[in-house]
Amino acid sequence: MAETDSFLHLARPLGPMAVGSAPTTAPLNVVIHPQALFSILDHSLRRNADQERVIGTLLGTRSEDGTEVEIRTTFAVGHTETTDQVEVDMEYQKQMLALHLKANPKEVLVGWYATSSELNTFSALIQNFYSGQGDGTFPHPAVHLTVSTEPGKDVETRAYISAPVGVTAERAADSAAFIPVPYEIRYGETEKSGLESIAAARDVESRAANIFTDIEALERAVEEVLGMIDRVSKYVESVIDEEAPASTALGQFLLNALALAPKVEPADIERDFNNHIQDVLVVSYLANTIRTQMELSNRLATAQLTLGGESGNAESGQRGGQRGGKGGRGGQQRTQDRSGEEARA
């Protein structure tokens, strides 16, 4: 989904803004985390049938120089939109923002998102609110992230900042020039494994996928590497045989990749690989052993509680019977005393 287009930034406010009140429009790079995209897509799936798009707030971190913004989390904001007006629940947005910032003090407000690629007057109104002073991102620009969620089409993502425009101050309040900025979707190895597991269920009718074990994941990774090596070998052979056009950039990339390969003997590589396999097997065995012990411990604890409850009820019944027996003996003794008194009388 990431784009590699070039961008030209014109950092000049065009509206009648007071000195020191215009947000900066310096070039920046936007980094999007997968969990933020999943949250946006989930919000889009849960929208009302009559809503064309939904909006929400973007939270993340900003570099010290302000040239890079990381979008880490999001939350939905309710709004209603008609042909001539838009209403946004700003009070809810402020309360949710305060709660999120209290739970994650390192994160800040970085912008807002919409599940539509369209940029209109309402988009400018919302953008000016998020980039304004006080509750907005001022003096930093607010990032507007658009995620296209049309059924049957690929998910398209765009990132923008804005510059104020307008002949008068009244027109500048509901106007903005959206400037596209470069972005990238950044994820780690753990997130990549999760994304691959989710993508595996894309073509399954039940939308369910099995979670691979460590050995299966390693096997899949080795197969992917072998497949890539095979494709590169075929491409190099076709270039040598003049069956495919040569690419200087691709050749330089392959040369740099080969230069990163460690200069070791094949026997050493095989030994290290086997040692790694043994480590993975040991970790898998220990994990399964711990899981079995936990299940056994839970079952023993449940059985002990069950047996303890039954024995407790039995002891209570016996104690009650003993108290009843004592009461019976007391009654018999009092009857005998009364009989003796009557005989003396």
Curated annotation (Swiss-Prot):
Residues 308-345 are annotated as: Disordered. It is found in: Cytoplasm. HAMAP family: eIF3f. PANTHER family: EUKARYOTIC TRANSLATION INITIATION FACTOR 3 SUBUNIT F (PTHR10540:SF6), EUKARYOTIC TRANSLATION INITIATION FACTOR 3 SUBUNIT F-RELATED (PTHR10540). Keywords: Cytoplasm, Initiation factor, Protein biosynthesis. One of its GO terms (biological process) is formation of cytoplasmic translation initiation complex. The keyword Transmembrane does not apply. Belongs to the eIF-3 subunit F family. Residues 30-166 form the MPN domain. The keyword Cytoplasm applies. GO terms for cellular component: eukaryotic 43S preinitiation complex; eukaryotic 48S preinitiation complex; eukaryotic translation initiation factor 3 complex, eIF3e; eukaryotic translation initiation factor 3 complex, eIF3m. One of its GO terms (molecular function) is translation initiation factor activity. Component of the eukaryotic translation initiation factor 3 (eIF-3) complex. Pfam families: JAB, MitMem_reg. Residues 335-345 have a biased composition (Basic and acidic residues). Residues 318-331 have a biased composition (Gly residues). This is Eukaryotic translation initiation factor 3 subunit F. Component of the eukaryotic translation initiation factor 3 (eIF-3) complex, which is involved in protein synthesis of a specialized repertoire of mRNAs and, together with other initiation factors, stimulates binding of mRNA and methionyl-tRNAi to the 40S ribosome. The eIF-3 complex specifically targets and initiates translation of a subset of mRNAs involved in cell proliferation.
